[in-house]
Amino acid sequence: MALRPARCYRTIERRSYTRKEYVRAVPQPKVVHYVMGNPSAEFPVQVQLVSKSDILIRHNALESSRIAGNKYILSECGRTGYLFNIRVYPHEILRENKMAAGAGADRISDGMRLSFGKAVGTAAKVKKGQEIITIGVNPEKFYAAKEALRRCSMKLPTACKIVVTKGKELIKD
């Protein structure tokens, strides 16, 4: 069965479901790396992507965002010239109660009986003002980091703002 659209899971409608014993198997998140670049270096400028609303971000949107941003910043700064960090983890389990459609579906389908649903993916619960991605760079590569975060935000289901949290005085306009 195909992946449902993200709009089905985007809003936070209720509190997190914590009874994991009912969920048989949780699919692995698609996000492969959470820290990329040079984690041992200290960068004077730090730029963050901040959410403008409360939202659930699916794991495949996070992975897509990571690939887009990391690819750009890697080409601009080189392998050791930046630190790219994803600050959220997809803990929320997304469930789907599959419904049969078509002729004779009423005889096959259970309807709302046993409607708990199967786990189809994971998502990160993000609050308004929470940092999603952080990039650390040298001052001369600030605009490359800003563009990388803009590309990251295009892949996410929420409006985001780019905030300089460290080294604002080092940036030349």
From Swiss-Prot:
This protein's GO cellular component annotations are:
ribonucleoprotein complex; ribosome
Gene3D superfamilies in the record, alphabetically?
Ribosomal protein L10e/L16 (3.90.1170.10)
Pfam short name (any one): Ribosomal_L16
Native organism is Methanococcus maripaludis (strain DSM 14266 / JCM 13030 / NBRC 101832 / S2 / LL)
The record's annotation in InterPro entries points to:
Ribosomal_uL16, Ribosomal_uL16_arc, Ribosomal_uL16_CS_euk_arc, Ribosomal_uL16_dom, Ribosomal_uL16_euk_arch, Ribosomal_uL16_sf
Q: Which SUPFAM superfamilies match?
A: Ribosomal protein L16p/L10e
Per the record, the gene is rpl10e
Q: What is this protein called?
A: Large ribosomal subunit protein uL16
A molecular function annotated in GO for this UniProt entry is: structural constituent of ribosome
Keywords linked to the UniProt accession? Ribonucleoprotein, Ribosomal protein
- Keyword 4Fe-4S in the entry? The reply is no
Q: Which family does it belong to?
A: Belongs to the universal ribosomal protein uL16 family.
